[in-house]
Amino acid sequence: MASSLVSRPHLTQRPVRAATLASATRPRLAAGALSGRCQAQAAGDLDDAHYMRRCVELARKAAGHTSPNPMVGCVIVRDGRVVGEGFHPKAGQPHAEVFALRDAGNLAENATAYVSLEPCNHYGRTPPCTEALINAKVKEVVVGMTDPNPIVASKGIEKLQGAGISVRVGVEEALCRKLNEAYIHRMLTGKAFATLRATLSMNGIITNQIGKGADQSGGYYSQLMKEYDGVIISSDLAKMSALPLSREAGTNQPLCIIIAQGESSRLHIPSLSQEHASRAIVLADSPVTVEPAGVEVAVFRQIDLESILQLLAQRGLCSVLVDFREAGESFASLLNDFQEDKLVQKVVVEVLPFWLASDGLSNLAFGGSQSFPLKNLELRDVNGSVLLEGYV
């Protein structure tokens, strides 16, 4: 099957110059002054964490644009002052280190480079970042985490060390891993990172609604559509509502993966024009003609979530949101035992401030018969609704 993925638009990156940071005054250490050394070490650790968090902040500027590449940010620091910053804007464009070194210019010599992900050491669509750092004569590189990509995996660190550059790894590692959780998952499993999203009423009824302003610019649902490469929806939702999209400025729209199980021989998607047919792909369990023309159809002998995630990863998608709206029993069956099979990594549930009557409403269950706690559960208020996010 030919890929129907839409090429991502160029994300322009202007040099990002941070405000000059005043050099912190360090106490002079007398010989054997253990407490002074500990204070200096603690101050250095705080600086490292500060600059690495800035790397992550920079990297997030390209959210939704870099896939299948990771998001990466880089900060160049010399004599306690930020002299260069950069982030990777889009697959095929220069990496974060290159932009930061350009920003720093000659001030990169003898500086410390902070980067959220291990610098690459191979030729792809861009030259190795290790060579750029070596040629710039930086004295030290601080890395948030090693790259799980087997092409890179510690080779970049070894290259830098071989050139006499000091390398430290693991600063704010948990934050750096969360930044690229989808990329890491795809590298380690060969499957797209999957998040299940559903909406509940206060009395636990699964509903097709989403909260006030959620799908508008700045709303949580619009943000999700910006961050995820694809969204899996039921054919019933595709027939009844507009396809999910992000309202964020300059964003890329996710690929809509429409599940058509037990459909008739024809599927009409009223909200999709032929001009934008490449925005969607239909996965069916029998041959089906889709309107408008031009929408790709993939026929499976049996549709299951594992096969879908493998297919999407092969096409370069790192992340996908499973949107549980207008979900019939066949769509819900995709999620049977997802926890046991480790097919879904994250759950997002919106609880609306409504008590819904259950008469006549289907309250489908999903996830199989096993109970399990969510990890790292977070909740926040979003326009009167409560949004819960946790990991399986």
Curated annotation (Swiss-Prot):
Residues given in the record as Zn(2+) binding sites: H95, C120, C129
Q: How is the cofactor bound?
A: Binds 1 zinc ion.
Cellular component terms, GO, for this chain's entry? chloroplast
Q: Which UniProt keywords apply?
A: Chloroplast, Hydrolase, Metal-binding, Plastid, Transit peptide, Zinc
SUPFAM superfamilies attached to this UniProt entry: Cytidine deaminase-like (SSF53927), Dihydrofolate reductase-like (SSF53597)
Q: Which reaction does it catalyse?
A: 2,5-diamino-6-hydroxy-4-(5-phosphoribosylamino)-pyrimidine + H2O + H(+) = 5-amino-6-(5-phospho-D-ribosylamino)uracil + NH4(+)
User: Pathway it belongs to?
Assistant: Cofactor biosynthesis; riboflavin biosynthesis; 5-amino-6-(D-ribitylamino)uracil from GTP: step 2/4
Q: What else is known?
A: Unlike bacteria that have a bifunctional, two-domain RibD enzyme, plants have a monofunctional reductase and a monofunctional deaminase, each having an enzymatically inactive domain.
Q: Which NCBIfam families does the UniProt record give?
A: eubact_ribD
Functional summary from the UniProt entry: Monofunctional pyrimidine deaminase involved in the riboflavin biosynthesis pathway. Also has a reductase domain that lacks catalytically essential substrate-binding residues.
Task: Fetch the PANTHER family from UniProt.
Answer: CYTOSINE DEAMINASE FAMILY MEMBER (PTHR11079), RIBOFLAVIN BIOSYNTHESIS PROTEIN PYRD, CHLOROPLASTIC (PTHR11079:SF162)
Q: What is this protein called?
A: Riboflavin biosynthesis protein PYRD, chloroplastic
Q: Gene behind this chain?
A: PYRD
